[in-house]
Amino acid sequence: MFEPVPDLNLEASVELGEVNIDQTTPMIKENSGFISRSRRLFAHRSKDDERKLALRFFLQRLYFLDHREIHYLFRCVDAVKDVTITKKNNIIVAPYIALLTIASKGCKLTETMIEAFFPELYNEHSKKFKFNSQVSIIQEKLGYQSGNYHVYDFEPYYSTVALAIRDEHSSGIFNIRQESYLVSSLSEITYRFYLINLKSDLVQWSASTGAVINQMVNTVLITVYEKLQLAIENDSQFTCSLAVESELPIKLLKDRNELFTKFINELKKTSSFKISKRDKDTLLKHFTYDWS
């Protein structure tokens, strides 16, 4: 009944050259991230499938999570498949559930870390979809204990840093036992540094809690990182007088320098990674080198 059309009965051999995606640049007004507020991104799927597909999209940025942790987060999202959280913007629910789940394991992200790994969440400026508003809504819907995501407890933020510099032999999900001494040391430095700023009336009280924490953590991280690079270059050691109870584990930092550098470079790419020269100079006074 039907006869093939000669012009369409063709065979073609297509050869693709090597393409480096990292070297491509976006066009003007082109955005590498897209989150639809009013339409379903995966309209042919159920809302549950849509959340899991969205989670896959977001979690690829958290390069330091292993397969067990990623699987655990997928199971957490799957556990709330029958819960209607938002009428619109369903896919944005997935990263919030991931953040709250990771926080329940003792790891939180500063504003700069959120911008680095979840820029869609950080750059949301509407009142309804702002970060703190969404956290409160999802906590209520899922039965989590309500409260602010950002609090003056520095250990969870440095626990995320510890996750990023773990070696490949860590056992258990979100396990940072080998790096726990680093978490304690960085936290102690930050607490004492924060108290110094309080006594000197240098804390900007008009800023949000998240902004103050972000400034403190960023200052400590970049200062320790720069001191570490100098110590590696000169084969020396350094100490911080603010780390009284938990000295900085310099050997651990040197051993994990490549991973630490990768994490710091991710933070440096963000617009919120701004360091006050005054704060940094104040903190530098408490660092000394051992050149012997």
Swiss-Prot record:
Pfam families: Pox_A8 (PF04745). Induction: Expressed in the early phase of the viral replicative cycle. It comes from the Viruses. Keywords: Activator, Early protein, Transcription, Transcription regulation. Heterodimer of a 45 kDa (A23R) and a 32 kDa (A8R) subunit to form the virus intermediate transcription factor (VITF)-3. Acts with RNA polymerase to initiate transcription from intermediate gene promoters. Belongs to the orthopoxvirus OPG134 family. This is Intermediate transcription factor 3 small subunit. It comes from Monkeypox virus. The lineage of its organism: Viruses, Varidnaviria, Bamfordvirae, Nucleocytoviricota, Pokkesviricetes. The gene is OPG134.
